[in-house]
Amino acid sequence: IKLEKIDPYSNELFILKNNKTNKRKNNVSNIRDGISEVFLNSAEILFNEGLDRQALIYAQISSYLAPNSDSSYYLLGRIFKSINNNERALEYFKKVNEYSLVTHDANIAYAETIYDLKGLNSSTQFLNNIKNSFPDNINYLRTMAELFYKADNFKKSIEYYDLIFKKIEKIEFKHWPLFYSSGIALERGKNWERAEKQFLTALQFVPNNPQVLNYLGYSWIDKGININEALEMIVNAAEQRPDDGYIIDSLGWAYYQIGKYEDAVINLEKAVELVSDSVIIDHLGDALFFSGRKIEAVFQWKRALEFNASDELKNILNNKINGDSLPKPGVNAVSKPI
């Protein structure tokens, strides 16, 4: 889960607080620096548009014109990470000055890249060393929480989220992503009661956020509770993001759970077109099965095996394919397989 960063204070305030001079701040003092800044801004725009290769060219020109530019180093690192060249990405993240305006972002990006290259222990060891130097910056704690979540260590992830909340003196609007992401960790860690409270708190700040509406609505549907409200929430999310395959999957699965299997098939077929995901394809197979289209259902279950299904899901799929078990009907459905 990657959400907007929460800064207890900006890097500029950190520099002032520690009485440090940012010797590498991008000061436009001559024509060469000015041209470098133009190329850097253009590179940032291209990168945000997903044009990585073009962005790389512009960022390299910017760095050539203004050597030792931390902003250029940081952007080059992000670009190389985006094109899966993690080794080069690390080289650039490491070049960022200790008291630069992008220091914290570069440190976090470095930790995330180390995770991809060497795993959890290396990344958390790096972060432990860094966060002790910046005890007031909760973004380091949040990154720890996210990395443990990514490693399926939900208990440890929750511990870091709890530590973050203890450090926040006053809850504000900007903290809503923390309630959302910690809610997901709690839900995955089988602590639904606390998770639900986190989602509901997030909704108090962002009542129409499609991510929160979808996750909470899907969870309610899956548990067979608050069905009508959950369906309204997912419909709201789907209207906002009609091209989000995961949200459309939630809508299809909601119809499945209330026994509207034909409506489920329509939406799940659309979801599969938008994103190839083993869980979504499995959902489609189940909906087809209860719509009386059993041959098509088996085809979809077999297809789901081709899309990086977890070991648990593989067992479920194989049992359904071999006829050793049947899919479960919707939790609030009264219809039976046709």
Regions found by a protein language model. Give the residues of each.
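Structural marker of alpha-solenoid helical repeat scaffolds
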Residues: L3-I6, L65, E98-S100, N132-F134, ...
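TPR alpha-solenoid repeat register
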Residues: Y9-L13, S72, A106, Y140, ...
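Canonical tetratricopeptide repeat
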Residues: E12, L16, N41, L75, ...
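TPR-adjacent "capping" and linker segments in tetratricopeptide-repeat scaffold/adaptor proteins
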Residues: K23-V38, E169-W176
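Residue-level recognition of tetratricopeptide repeat
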Residues: E44, R78, E112, E146, ...
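Register position in tetratricopeptide repeats
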Residues: N48, S82, D116-L117, K150, ...
